[in-house]
């Protein structure tokens, strides 16, 4: 990875982590104040990768966010021989470097959607950006879905009018449970292997994707912060969370990439919900 590219992308992911954690802690504070509770805070844990690099896992378990994790990492080394053929540009020597941020939020309220987001920059003998964000409501609402998609469409349209329809389609295709023949949530955008030939433009786009998430998801959470919910709704949420687990363990590229590169297991599996039911 080019040193300057590595530094500026890694610094951005760290900055975005701080912005997201600050906003989520603020939401916890807003809720706690009305209930005379002590607001939850993120707990950070650093980890080192044996083959090179490491990361920081930020985890919060609160009254609003039952479990929310924000991970940043910068790792480098060599892919195992059996994994090299799956990664563009790694076929010859297997060398790679990757930096990125990943976020998964599971809310206590079954009325507030779960959310997944990540962006990353990877170099082998080639280089590219990837990432996106998607929403998983248990009780979908059309206006909420439209608002989420509109935020990402605005970010996409600044760069290419073809980005949003392309990345939306890729998201719908990627977050699909083939064995159940059903989607995981209401989508968003998903892009990978993005290299337009203009690093600055691709990096700027990836930054705007992060800011789009920061602008829209906290608004969705706040809109339902104090809505009452029933035991039946909670039960349904726990059952539907099972689909989330199935996808992440069977299909998720990030999970596979992390495990195949000897990443931190706790950080990799942070995406799993804290409580789930299988019927």
Swiss-Prot record:
<keyword id="KW-0627">Porphyrin biosynthesis</keyword>
<feature type="site" description="Important for dimerization">
    <location>
        <position position="179"/>
    </location>
</feature>
<keyword id="KW-0560">Oxidoreductase</keyword>
<feature type="binding site">
    <location>
        <position position="106"/>
    </location>
    <ligand>
        <name>a divalent metal cation</name>
    </ligand>
</feature>
<feature type="binding site">
    <location>
        <begin position="118"/>
        <end position="120"/>
    </location>
    <ligand>
        <name>substrate</name>
    </ligand>
</feature>
<comment type="function">
    <text>Involved in the heme biosynthesis. Catalyzes the aerobic oxidative decarboxylation of propionate groups of rings A and B of coproporphyrinogen-III to yield the vinyl groups in protoporphyrinogen-IX.</text>
</comment>
<keyword id="KW-0963">Cytoplasm</keyword>
<feature type="binding site">
    <location>
        <position position="102"/>
    </location>
    <ligand>
        <name>substrate</name>
    </ligand>
</feature>
<dbReference type="Pfam" id="PF01218">
    <property type="entry name" value="Coprogen_oxidas"/>
</dbReference>
<feature type="active site" description="Proton donor">
    <location>
        <position position="116"/>
    </location>
</feature>
<feature type="region of interest" description="Important for dimerization">
    <location>
        <begin position="244"/>
        <end position="279"/>
    </location>
</feature>
<dbReference type="GO" id="GO:0042803">
    <property type="term" value="F:protein homodimerization activity"/>
</dbReference>
<feature type="binding site">
    <location>
        <position position="149"/>
    </location>
    <ligand>
        <name>a divalent metal cation</name>
    </ligand>
</feature>
<dbReference type="InterPro" id="IPR001260">
    <property type="entry name" value="Coprogen_oxidase_aer"/>
</dbReference>
<dbReference type="InterPro" id="IPR036406">
    <property type="entry name" value="Coprogen_oxidase_aer_sf"/>
</dbReference>
<comment type="pathway">
    <text>Porphyrin-containing compound metabolism; protoporphyrin-IX biosynthesis; protoporphyrinogen-IX from coproporphyrinogen-III (O2 route): step 1/1.</text>
</comment>
<feature type="binding site">
    <location>
        <position position="116"/>
    </location>
    <ligand>
        <name>a divalent metal cation</name>
    </ligand>
</feature>
<comment type="similarity">
    <text>Belongs to the aerobic coproporphyrinogen-III oxidase family.</text>
</comment>
<dbReference type="GO" id="GO:0006782">
    <property type="term" value="P:protoporphyrinogen IX biosynthetic process"/>
</dbReference>
<comment type="subunit">
    <text>Homodimer.</text>
</comment>
<keyword id="KW-0479">Metal-binding</keyword>
<feature type="binding site">
    <location>
        <position position="179"/>
    </location>
    <ligand>
        <name>a divalent metal cation</name>
    </ligand>
</feature>
<dbReference type="GO" id="GO:0005737">
    <property type="term" value="C:cytoplasm"/>
</dbReference>
<keyword id="KW-0350">Heme biosynthesis</keyword>
<dbReference type="InterPro" id="IPR018375">
    <property type="entry name" value="Coprogen_oxidase_CS"/>
</dbReference>
<dbReference type="GO" id="GO:0004109">
    <property type="term" value="F:coproporphyrinogen oxidase activity"/>
</dbReference>
<protein>
    <recommendedName>
        <fullName>Oxygen-dependent coproporphyrinogen-III oxidase</fullName>
        <ecNumber>1.3.3.3</ecNumber>
    </recommendedName>
</protein>
<dbReference type="GO" id="GO:0046872">
    <property type="term" value="F:metal ion binding"/>
</dbReference>
């Amino acid at each position: 990875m080019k040193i300057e590219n590595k530094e500026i992308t890694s610094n951005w992911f760290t900055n975005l982590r701080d912005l997201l954690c600050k906003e989520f802690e603020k939401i916890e504070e807003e809720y706690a104040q009305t209930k005379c509770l002590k607001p939850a805070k993120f707990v950070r844990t650093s980890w080192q990768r044996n083959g090179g690099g490491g990361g920081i896992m930020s985890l919060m378990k609160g009254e609003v966010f039952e479990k929310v994790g924000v991970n940043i990492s910068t790792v480098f080394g060599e892919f195992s021989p059996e994994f090299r053929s799956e990664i563009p540009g790694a076929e010859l020597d297997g060398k790679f470097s990757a930096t990125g941020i990943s976020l998964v939020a599971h809310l206590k309220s079954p009325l507030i959607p779960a959310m997944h987001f990540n962006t990353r920059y990877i170099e082998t003998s080639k280089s590219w950006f990837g990432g996106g964000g998607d929403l998983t409501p248990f009780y979908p609402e059309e206006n909420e879905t439209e608002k989420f998609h509109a935020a990402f469409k605005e970010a996409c349209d600044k760069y290419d009018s073809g980005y949003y329809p392309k990345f939306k389609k890729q998201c719908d295709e990627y977050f699909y449970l083939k064995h159940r023949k059903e989607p995981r949530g209401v989508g968003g955008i998903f892009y990978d292997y993005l290299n337009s030939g203009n690093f600055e433009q691709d990096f700027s786009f990836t930054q705007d994707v992060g800011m789009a998430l920061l602008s829209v998801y906290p608004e969705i959470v706040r809109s339902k912060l104090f809505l009452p919910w029933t035991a039946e709704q909670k039960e349904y949420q726990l059952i539907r969370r099972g689909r989330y687990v199935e996808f992440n363990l069977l299909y998720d590229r990030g999970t596979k990439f992390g495990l195949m590169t000897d990443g931190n297991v706790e950080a990799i599996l942070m995406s799993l919900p804290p409580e789930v039911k299988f019927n």
